[in-house]
A protein has these predicted regions:
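Non-catalytic terminal accessory segments
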Residues: 1-124
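Contiguous hydrophobic segments
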Residues: 11-18, 27, 31, 152-163, ...
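Membrane-interface segments at or immediately adjacent to transmembrane helices
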Residues: 119-181
Length: 182
């Protein structure tokens, strides 16, 4: 198990180094002070994921732990999408289709995806699916109303107020059965 975590953290840092080097190439014309500031911000974000993971069992104030969790997990997703976008532009360059603004386009696409995902996370919605099951019941009962919820992320990801909102949304459906997944 420790080997798995070492490999996972190594991949995470390799991805961040790849993003950092690509960003350094894209920002070559910027003043030194701007580069230093962006480097400090970048590595603070990159290390926040590791920090939030290591601080899980400590007695941090809830606000600090929640903030570290939000930044750390957000940075993990940022790293994933940014690396994928940068690889696409590097493949273009490999096949002699260089894109001068590949880093900036990757950054824009990644931040757009993160913003879209965060908005949807903060504004949960309900969807209705009617599923017909061709099975006779013992009693000729009314249709069963099932509510399925997933990706709630209890803990530092979802606080008590957000959980209360989810419970109200679920109860408003008046379900016969609640399924909780993920």
């Amino acid at each position: 198990m420790p080997t798995f975590f070492v490999v996972l953290i190594s991949i995470y840092f390799a991805g961040n180094i790849y993003i950092f080097k690509s960003g350094a190439q894209a920002l070559v014309a910027q003043p030194f002070g701007v580069k230093v500031l962006l480097a400090v911000l970048f590595w603070s974000g990159a290390l926040s994921f590791i920090g939030s993971f290591l601080a899980r069992n400590t007695q941090l104030p809830v606000v600090l732990a929640h903030t570290a969790h939000e930044i750390g997990t957000g940075w993990l997703v940022f790293t994933l999408y940014m690396v994928l976008c940068l690889i696409v532009f590097d493949l273009f360059r490999l096949f002699n289709f260089p894109c001068k603004y590949g880093f900036y386009i990757s950054l824009f696409l990644t931040l757009s995806l993160l913003s879209y995902g965060y908005y949807n996370y903060q504004h949960p919605k309900t969807e209705v699916f009617n599923i017909v099951i061709n099975k006779q019941t013992v009693h000729n009962e009314q249709p069963l109303k099932v509510v399925s919820v997933s990706d709630i992320h209890l803990g530092y990801g979802t606080d008590k107020e957000e959980l209360k909102q989810y419970v109200e949304m679920i109860n408003a459906q008046k379900p016969d059965l609640i399924l909780i997944g993920g």
